[in-house]
């Protein structure tokens, strides 16, 4: 059971791809009007268009008095590494696109196993000393790497990471076993991405859909489709969702919440996220309508115990083939 409701962060991955400037701008406004303040983007999202769109909104990001917090990431992909020069290039390019002097949170998007981590961390510390970001974050690192990084930073007097962004939802709970205790020990808060398992937990898909023609989504018609298919498109996942849908109908009858409502409420009320420790859920979207629906669901209350039990049964069905939280 969650302790106090986790915060909500706006995931900007689809800005500049499935969302144009107008819908992106409207989504940011809708998000901020509900009292949320943090936006998450990355150097690689939509080939830089996500950051560019956010920078053009005139939010005054990274400046004194700005209530909106912005996070971005450097990644070892598309010809880049996490060597010092590439980390600097990515962050400084992100700052130009975002039109801000500094970001509130700068992540290492995932590990670069070809670069000694000490080199990357020292480069991050230098960039922090230059005032180019406030907090350091990690994403997609295995728990022993997190422990190693925290130990190295403490030993060398470098900036310590304070946030970890990882994959977590009702049917993807690998992070609970070893990563969460590690993060609590070192004082990192956890930001969950894929809270709806790429859309699988909306309940709108059937296993057989993989063989037909489908509208564009995380699973179909985009550069990351195969990644998401490999993560979540397994028969046991659909069997688990059916268990939850049955429990919803049995427990609530004709007024049963939707599958997506149940999945969002599980994240905010029944997961291991703790609002008191600064944990958060990253909500992405492919349209303004979808975002407004999900933001309304965030404000709903806890689920009945029978539905929480059904989510646990679903997790037990799929745990053996849970995708790794690290790369």
From Swiss-Prot:
Q: Which positions does the site annotation Lowers pKa of active site Tyr cover?
A: 73
Q: Do you know what upregulates this one?
A: By the phenolic antioxidant ethoxyquin.
Q: Note whether Zinc occurs among the keywords.
A: no
What family does this belong to?
Belongs to the aldo/keto reductase family. Aldo/keto reductase 2 subfamily.
GO cellular component terms, alphabetically, are: cytoplasm
Spell out the protein name for this chain: Aldo-keto reductase family 7 member A3
Chain residues that bind citrate: 109, 228, 231
Its annotated compartments are: Cytoplasm
Organism, by scientific name, is Rattus norvegicus (Rat)
| Functional description taken from the UniProt entry | Catalyzes the NADPH-dependent reduction of various carbonyl-containing compounds, including aldehydes, ketones, and toxic products from cellular metabolism or environmental exposure. Can reduce the dialdehyde form of aflatoxin B1 (AFB1) into alcohol derivatives, via monoaldehydes intermediates, thus preventing the formation of protein adducts that contribute to AFB1-induced toxicity.
Alphabetically list the UniProt keywords: Cytoplasm, Detoxification, NADP, Nucleotide-binding, Oxidoreductase, Phosphoprotein
Catalytic activities: a primary alcohol + NADP(+) = an aldehyde + NADPH + H(+); aflatoxin B1 dialdehyde + NADPH + H(+) = aflatoxin B1 C(6a)-monoaldehyde + NADP(+); aflatoxin B1 dialdehyde + NADPH + H(+) = aflatoxin B1 C(8)-monoaldehyde + NADP(+); aflatoxin B1 C(6a)-monoaldehyde + NADPH + 2 H(+) = aflatoxin B1 triol + NADP(+)
Q: Does this entry carry the keyword Oxidoreductase? A: yes
GO BP terms in the entry? aflatoxin catabolic process; aflatoxin metabolic process
Binding of NADP(+), residues? 13, 18, 40, 140, 194, 196, 198, 204, 218, 286, 290, 293-294, 327
CDD domains, per database record? AKR_AKR7A1-5
For this UniProt entry, what is the primary localization, expressed as one broad class? cytoplasm
EC number(s) on record? 1.1.1.2
Q: How does it assemble?
A: Homodimer. Heterodimer with AKR7A2.
Q: Which domain of life is it from?
A: Eukaryota
Q: Which residues form the active site?
A: 45
Molecular function GO terms recorded: aldo-keto reductase (NADPH) activity; identical protein binding; NADP+ binding
* Phosphoserine found at: 2
Q: How is the protein's activity regulated, according to its record?
A: Inhibited by citrate.
């Amino acid at each position: 059971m969650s302790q106090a409701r986790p915060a909500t962060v706006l995931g900007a991955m689809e800005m500049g791809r499935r969302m144009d400037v107008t819908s992106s701008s409207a989504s940011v406004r809708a998000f901020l009007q509900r009292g949320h303040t943090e936006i998450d983007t990355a150097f690689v999202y939509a080939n830089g268009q996500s950051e560019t769109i956010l920078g053009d909104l005139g939010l005054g990001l990274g400046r004194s008095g700005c209530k909106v917090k912005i996070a971005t990431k450097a990644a070892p992909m598309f010809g880049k590494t996490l060597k010092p020069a590439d980390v600097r290039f990515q962050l400084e390019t992100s700052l130009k696109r975002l039109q801000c002097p500094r970001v509130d949170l700068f992540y290492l998007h995932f590990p670069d196993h070809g670069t000694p981590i000490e080199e990357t961390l020292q480069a991050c510390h230098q960039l922090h000393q230059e005032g180019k970001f406030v907090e350091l974050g990690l994403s997609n690192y295995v728990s022993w790497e997190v422990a190693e990084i925290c130990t190295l930073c403490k030993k060398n007097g470098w900036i310590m990471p304070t946030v970890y962004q990882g994959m977590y939802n009702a049917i993807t709970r690998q992070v609970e076993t070893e990563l969460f205790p590690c993060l609590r020990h070192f004082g990192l808060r956890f930001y969950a991405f894929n809270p709806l398992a790429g859309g699988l937990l909306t309940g709108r898909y059937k296993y057989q859909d993989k063989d037909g023609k489908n509208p564009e989504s995380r699973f179909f018609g985009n550069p990351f489709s195969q990644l998401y298919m490999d993560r979540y498109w397994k028969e046991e996942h659909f069997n688990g969702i059916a268990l939850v849908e049955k429990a919803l109908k049995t427990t609530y009858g004709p007024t049963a919440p939707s599958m997506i409502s149940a999945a969002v409420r599980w994240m905010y009320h029944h997961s291991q996220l703790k609002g008191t420790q600064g944990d958060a859920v990253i909500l992405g979207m492919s349209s303004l309508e979808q975002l407004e629906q999900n933001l309304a669901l965030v404000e709903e209350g806890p689920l009945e115990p029978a539905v929480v039990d059904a989510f646990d049964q679903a997790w037990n069905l799929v745990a053996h083939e849970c995708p790794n939280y690290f790369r």
